[in-house]
UniProtKB/Swiss-Prot annotation:
GO terms for cellular component: cytosol. It comes from the Bacteria. SUPFAM superfamilies: Trm112p-like (SSF158997). The lineage of its organism: Bacteria, Pseudomonadati, Pseudomonadota, Alphaproteobacteria, Hyphomicrobiales. HAMAP family: UPF0434. This is UPF0434 protein Avi_4243. InterPro entries: Trm112-like.
Amino acid sequence: MDQRMNGVDPKMLELLVCPLTNGRLTLNRENNELVSEKARLAYPIRDGIPIMLVSEARKIED
C-alpha cells in the first residue's frame, strides 16, 4: 500500500515529530497511525490529517 493511500503527503510525514518527545514518527499503515516508539504513543490519522495531540494518542502496550 502506498503512503498516499491514507491521504497523508509523504513529504509532510518526514517533517512531523512527536509533540511530546520531538522524536521521529513511523507510519503504521495497518492502523492508520503515526507511532512514536520513544513516547509509546500512536497518533491517529483521520481523513488524511494526522492528529498530533497527546490527548488523542493511543498508548502502546507491550
